[in-house]
């Protein structure tokens, strides 16, 4: 194929899934000329697996994306068909918002947002190779011979890199949902010296809604109380006309069908070579691993308002098509169901993430960034969070500005990226609340208070969003201060109220703020005993006031740990340090440090196999020579 010189750009993003959409929008909105190339324009921000956004940890990521100026939260708020707050009976650290998406509306809305964006060109094309000169990425070449030059490239290829779909004994080259795979680019990345791994993920069958007997399933409705992912979505926009999901279960017959066909299951026959996700196992894997369980939950999730397709969550499988049909017909409510799409597994190449800097720039090739499933993660939200950060950092580098690296104490996005570049992953990585040490301060409700300032500083958060954030922040601070001034006296009314709550009465007067610290007392109950504020408070302000006061002691302890971490993050490790030359370091520590090349003492301390004694030796070694402090 003859090459020709096509247009030049500042940033080129390869792949328009959830990572690529965020990366391209972020770069363009920060003022750099951006090109977004993708294999098929009809699959921009497509949902090839579950038609949903959010859930534990993931929902917080969507809020963080929004607080930084990203798009995912706004997009799902326009296109959901059901919204639910999960874990409402638990503490605020694990509450999570989850939306059922109209997957076609979601993709169409995101594509149109991209098309309307200034500084951003969306184009269909298959990238076959990168233009690399003297170890620096300078652009891309497509299958049609177009050579696009740029100052930075972000690869967000999802599961397309040398993708292969597997259904029973059948295995063929394909991207997700029978789209075209990216073979040339996958091979080229290997040739450039990047270490590549092979992962696997899977998806369940889709069934026809009109053939489901919903009368024998359990209805799962959405919430009546307004909730949104984006801080800019008003309560008045809340969709009260929501679609339910439905709950059913596998049974012993289902399990017998799977058991007798395990000899045809690709994950047990050796056809599947890639490593699968531990936290999203196939149904055949669940039957083997949890043989004592008589049944497994299945959620029937509509894929949109204008389609009959229903996603059978919990039934991910790569068993042969005939077995999938038999399996479905054994499930209550699905006895006569028509399968519209067969479940499948997909294997794909991933860039081993220890080759990345915390900015998501590769260490091997300068100005080349990777994000999303290409880095070994699973999930749309994880992909979008990485895409946003890669796009931001590519733009900042071009502008000659300091990079934006979120710490573990800043957000789940920071936890995820640090896990990837510091610890790596040997299976598709999924964000969990348990991965965050500071989850009490990384909550769904306070992502704006944590990250809006950063988003505004880099030019992504627009003035209207920033002004609304400042108003909310001031209102929270003012109300906390007001509750610290008013006293509640042990009147008959107060004592009678406490008696109805089964709580101890007051001996002396108490500040309203301290009264609210009692676990059984709500803000509304405190409010009845003190004068009302001058202006009625937004429910989100009240929620924030209540959480900050009730959990003040725990939050204070967490913040003390954060400050200690910041001091360690401030101790930078010089580049190209020779760990083999440091006497006293354990052999494993030398190997791990040499491989990962941590940038700070804090990052080094989180590497598996590097113990506190190794860190002490490393700090002494650096302090005897030169130690660079992190700017700011």
UniProtKB/Swiss-Prot annotation:
Keywords: Cytoplasm, FAD, Flavoprotein, NAD, tRNA processing. FAD binds at residues 15-20, 127, 182, 373. It is found in: Cytoplasm. It comes from the Bacteria. Its main location: cytoplasm. NAD(+) binds at residues 276-290. One of its GO terms (molecular function) is flavin adenine dinucleotide binding. PROSITE patterns: GIDA_1, GIDA_2. Belongs to the MnmG family. Homodimer. Heterotetramer of two MnmE and two MnmG subunits. NCBIfam families: mnmG_gidA (TIGR00136). NAD-binding protein involved in the addition of a carboxymethylaminomethyl (cmnm) group at the wobble position (U34) of certain tRNAs, forming tRNA-cmnm(5)s(2)U34. This is tRNA uridine 5-carboxymethylaminomethyl modification enzyme MnmG. It comes from Enterococcus faecalis (strain ATCC 700802 / V583). The gene is mnmG.
């Amino acid at each position: 194929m003859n090459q020709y010189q096509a247009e030049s750009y500042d940033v080129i993003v390869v792949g328009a899934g959830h990572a690529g959409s965020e990366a391209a929008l972020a770069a363009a909105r920060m003022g750099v000329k951006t090109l977004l190339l993708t294999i098929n324009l009809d699959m921009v921000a497509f949902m090839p697996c579950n038609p949903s956004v959010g859930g534990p940890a993931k929902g917080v990521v969507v809020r963080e994306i929004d607080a930084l100026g990203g798009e995912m939260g706004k997009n799902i708020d326009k296109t959901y068909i059901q919204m639910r707050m999960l874990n409402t009976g638990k503490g605020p650290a694990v509450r999570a918002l989850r939306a059922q998406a109209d997957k076609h509306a979601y993709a169409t809305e995101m594509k149109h947002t991209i098309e309307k964006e200034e500084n951003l060109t969306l184009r269909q094309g298959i990238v076959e190779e990168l233009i690399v000169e003297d170890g620096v990425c300078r652009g891309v070449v497509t299958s049609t011979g177009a050579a696009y030059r740029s100052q930075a490239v972000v690869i967000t290829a999802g599961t397309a890199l040398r993708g292969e779909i597997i259904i029973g004994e059948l295995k063929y080259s394909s991207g997700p949902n029978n789209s075209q795979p990216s073979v040339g680019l996958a091979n080229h990345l290997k040739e450039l010296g990047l270490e590549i791994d092979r992962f696997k993920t899977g998806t369940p069958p889709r069934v026809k809604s009109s053939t489901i007997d919903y009368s024998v399933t359990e209805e799962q409705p959405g919430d009546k109380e307004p909730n949104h992912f984006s801080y800019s979505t008003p309560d008045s926009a809340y969709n009260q006309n929501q679609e339910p999901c439905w709950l059913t279960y596998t049974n012993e017959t289902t399990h017998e069908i799977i058991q007798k066909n395990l000899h045809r299951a690709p994950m047990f026959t050796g056809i599947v070579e890639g490593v699968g996700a531990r936290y999203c196992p196939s149904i055949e894997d669940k039957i083997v691993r949890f043989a004592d369980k008589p049944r497994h939950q299945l959620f029937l999730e509509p894929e949109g308002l204008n389609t009959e397709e229903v996603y059978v969550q919990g039934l991910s499988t790569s068993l042969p098509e005939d077995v999938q049909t038999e399996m479905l017909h054994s499930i209550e409510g699905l006895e006569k169901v028509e399968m519209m799409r067969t479940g499948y597994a997909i294997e794909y190449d991933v860039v081993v993430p220890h080759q990345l800097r915390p900015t998501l720039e590769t260490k091997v090739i300068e100005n080349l960034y990777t994000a999303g499933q290409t880095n070994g993660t699973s999930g749309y939200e994880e992909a979008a969070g990485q895409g946003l950060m890669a796009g931001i950092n590519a733009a900042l580098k071009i502008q000659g500005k300091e990079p934006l690296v979120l710490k573990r104490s800043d957000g789940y996005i920071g936890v995820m990226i640090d896990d990837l570049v510091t610890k790596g992953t040997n299976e598709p990585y999924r964000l969990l609340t348990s991965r965050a040490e500071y989850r009490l301060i990384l909550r769904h409700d306070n992502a704006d208070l944590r990250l809006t300032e950063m988003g505004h500083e880099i030019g992504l958060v627009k003035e209207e969003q920033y002004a609304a954030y400042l108003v909310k922040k001031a209102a929270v601070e003012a109300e906390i201060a007001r509750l610290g001034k008013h006293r509640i006296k042990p009147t008959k009314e107060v004592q009678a109220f406490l008696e109805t709550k089964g709580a101890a009465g007051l001996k002396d007067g108490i500040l309203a703020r301290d009264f609210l610290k009692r676990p059984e007392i709500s803000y509304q109950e405190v409010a009845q005993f003190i004068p009302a504020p001058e202006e009625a408070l937004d429910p989100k302000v009240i929620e924030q006031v209540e959480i900050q006061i009730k959990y003040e002691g725990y939050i204070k302890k967490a913040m003390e740990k954060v400050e200690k971490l910041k001091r360690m993050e401030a101790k930078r490790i010089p580049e190209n340090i020779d760990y083999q030359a440091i006497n006293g370091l354990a052999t494993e520590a030398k190997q791990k440090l040499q491989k990962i090349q941590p940038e700070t003492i804090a990052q080094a301390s989180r590497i598996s196999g590097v113990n506190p004694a190794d860190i002490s030796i490393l700090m002494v070694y650096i302090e005897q020579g030169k130690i660079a402090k992190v700017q700011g």
